[in-house]
Amino acid sequence: MKGNNIMKINAEQRELLNNILANKEFLAEFLKATTENKHKEVPDLNIGDTITIADITWRKFKEDENGNSYMLADDVVEESNFGDTNDWRDSPIRKNLSVLVEKIKEEIGDRIVPIEVNLFSHDGLDDYGTCEDLVSILTYDLYRNNRKNIKQIDSWFWLATPDSTPSGCGSSYVRYVGSDGDVGCSWYDSCGAVRPFFILRNTEGVSNL
């Protein structure tokens, strides 16, 4: 009798497995939809609109040709020195932002778009090349090309752009944005504000803008 019960359970398990395999596409779509429903509903955003993600208020300052939204922290999230050099790739700020990446992913899933950060120096040198981040800080070019859409704050904040590089005037100075919106440079071990940004993927197709 006990053996018959075991055989009956195994048969039910086999039947269940067969049903799952027969409907695996439906199951995959169901699981995907269930996961997506756990993520934050993000409304359509215009330039200047804000949304709170990972307990930070983000303001849209740019939209690219694919309709992706560039979201900049509306205020300072931390204060830190830039590191031991002006190379963003080795900055402790960059490493700290990896924690923020995970918090953002928990709320919006795969809607965060990789950022190619161009570390072309202010004096025209490319020693540092580029790097890829999911959350980063603005470069000089990204700031100046969108300055009119970027809210000024009371603190000066770091840019990822070096003032020069080892093949030029050295690796000591980093560009920053002052509280008046002007751009200057500071020694890498100064304590400056960190104002990160990320790119929010468009899920509605290519923008008509």
Regions found by a protein language model. Give the residues of each.
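Collagenous Gly-X-Y triple-helix signature in extracellular proteins
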Residues: 8-209
